[in-house]
């Protein structure tokens, strides 16, 4: 199901992190036919309720000062997004060519019924296998760069690691922000997700510093 307008645009001459993520976004869309939307970097936004509680959630920038929530939903089909961690590291390999390293995660949320006609089994391992095979393909990142997969998370609270959904579930505090509705609708078959943590090390992007 897709009922939300999503505005995916790419910078003409991206640098550094934007360059790496745009390349990966494009390869995800080209290689995964079941993926409806490949978002770029997510940003951590906050909602405040009348009781003073703060709810943190990931959101993608959609242009014109608009953000789209990336919490579990069926508004724009199967989707992915990047969660990038601080800090990003720069190692002075040489004055003209420092090494740039960043860590993050690629998150997928999808509806199995939209991918497989057979619902007698749960096909999350097949999805995971397909994604990992793509991400470990030689040349998946360009130039003098290397992508390393470090961890894979599949439990719902871990997929949204670093956001309020993780805290709510780990503290057994099932209240607020429609969490009960998420339980009944999105945290069971046919919905599923993946959080694939990675690091990317590159040198060629930092050449822009020397211009």
Give, region by region, the residue ranges found by the protein language model.
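Short, flexible beta-strand-to-coil junctions
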Residues: 87, 111-113, 201-203
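A broad, low-specificity signal marking well-ordered, structured residues that form hydrophobic/aromatic
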Residues: 79-80, 104, 196
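Polar low-complexity intrinsically disordered regions enriched in Ser/Thr and small residues
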Residues: 43, 54-55, 66, 142, ...
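Hydrophobic side chains in beta-strands
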Residues: 84, 108, 196-200
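A broad, low-specificity signal for short, low-complexity segments enriched in glycine/proline
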Residues: 56-71, 143-161
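Extracellular/virion structural assembly segments
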Residues: 93-101, 105-151
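Small/polar-rich, solvent-exposed N-terminal microdomains that initiate assembly or binding
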Residues: 1-94
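Short, charged interaction patches at domain edges and termini
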Residues: 1-38, 95-99, 149-211
């Amino acid at each position: 199901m897709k009922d939300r307008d999503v505005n995916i645009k790419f910078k003409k001459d991206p640098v550094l992190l934007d360059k790496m993520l745009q390349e990966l976004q494009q390869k995800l869309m080209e290689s995964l036919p079941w993926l409806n939307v490949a978002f770029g970097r997510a940003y951590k936004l906050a909602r405040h309720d009348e009781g003073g509680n703060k709810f943190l959630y990931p959101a993608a920038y959609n242009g014109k000062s608009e953000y789209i929530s990336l919490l579990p939903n069926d508004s724009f089909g199967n989707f992915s997004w990047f969660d990038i961690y601080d800090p990003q590291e720069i190692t002075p390999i040489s004055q003209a060519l420092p090494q740039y390293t960043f860590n993050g995660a690629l998150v997928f949320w999808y509806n199995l019924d939209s991918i497989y006609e057979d619902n007698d089994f749960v096909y999350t391992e097949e999805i995971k296998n397909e994604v990992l095979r793509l991400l470990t393909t030689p040349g998946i990142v360009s130039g003098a760069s290397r992508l390393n997969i470090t961890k894979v998370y599949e439990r719902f609270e871990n997929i949204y690691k670093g956001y309020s959904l993780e805290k709510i579930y780990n503290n057994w505090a099932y209240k607020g922000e429609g969490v009960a509705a998420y339980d009944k609708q999105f945290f069971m078959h046919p919905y599923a997700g993946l959080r694939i943590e990675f690091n990317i090390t590159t040198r060629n992007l930092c050449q822009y510093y020397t211009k």
